[in-house]
Amino acid sequence: MKKIVFILLLSVASVFAFEELNMDNFESKIKGKNVIIDFYAVWCPPCKVLNNKLEEYDIVKPDNVTIYKINIDDQPLITKKYGITRLPSLVYFQDGKAVKTKIGIQSVNELESNANSIFN
């Protein structure tokens, strides 16, 4: 019984897992798309709160918006390129170009409002 519960929890968690970007896939993943990238660190408590909000937003977000994550400790070059110095930070990309950065925890309504104003 414990194994079944564990497997169910893993499958639910994987539904909400966002793909991690790195130097190898970064450009191809953001090119020609509306993208929100969550710059985070595993040691950052507010980043975990924002991740939960992003999971909630992912359920209601438009199909033309994709959410990715970048661990700042694993990807220092990308982090530096986009001037990320505070966490959590969301960078909104349109057609491969960074168009806006938001710092801090955002509610689902704020995420939705920001995406609508940027991508519509």
Feature-to-residue mapping (PLM):
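A short beta-strand-turn-helix
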Residues: F18-K33
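Short active-site neighborhood of thiol/selenol oxidoreductases, capturing the structured segment around
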Residues: I30-V42, V91
